[in-house]
Amino acid sequence: DKHIAFSCSSDYYGNTTWQLNNIGTYQPGNAMLAMEAMRYLFGKDAHPARWRKVLKDLKWAGRMEEVLPGVYVDGAHNISAVDAFTRSVPKDEGGYIIVFSAVKDKEYEKMVSMLCKNLQPDMYIVTHIEDARGEDAKRLGSIFRQYTDRPVRVLESVKDALMTALAQRGSHRIYCLGSLYLTGMIKELIQEVNTDA
């Protein structure tokens, strides 16, 4: 399913089940933080029932965002975000491909280690984001190979990485992460493909 339901019971919210249009398991905490800020700022005038619908329809750009059926981008670009990402990938699904890139000034080796330790994708596809800060794809690929025995493909262009993932996936999901730049580039490429279609 492509949503998360969670509940909270309090004098303010009553016994309410909330639903988020997102599969990121870290999003209920973010939603509750926003709800508490709303309660603090607006008190009884906040209308929690209206916010329930807002949360159900809300989409967080770049946070486990489904950009094509079965294709997700997540801006996870640090260790805590990658940890949250690994906990959000459904363990009961058939298979998936991970597309990854990172910038040079991030702790990408720890991020790669965490991905490889916690996930078992069909394949990792590593690429280079087209920015001076982008880490070399071959370097990232060699780090992945230190931590996993899963197939690792190194493709220099984000477009080639995405097209390869789409061609290889069959009915499997694709998750793209490691950099906000990568998230933006993937979304841009998908927009181009949709415009050209």
Question: Model segments located where?
Answer:
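Extended acidic/charged loop-beta regions that coordinate divalent cations
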Residues: 1-17
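Short glycine-/acidic-enriched loop or helix-start segments at secondary-structure transitions
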Residues: 82-83, 108-110, 136-137, 185-188
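Active-site catalytic pocket residues across diverse enzymes, especially alpha/beta-hydrolases
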Residues: 41-42, 89, 119, 144, ...
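Short SAM/SAH-binding signature in class I
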Residues: 33, 169-178, 182
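Glycine-rich beta-strand-to-loop/alpha-helix junction loops that act as flexible
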Residues: 100-102, 129, 177-180
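C-terminal helical cap/extension that packs against the catalytic core
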Residues: 2-4, 70, 112-173
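Nucleotide phosphate-binding/pyrophosphate-handling subdomain across enzymes
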Residues: 12-123
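Glycine/aspartate-rich loop-and-adjacent alpha/beta segment that forms the canonical ThDP
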Residues: 179-197
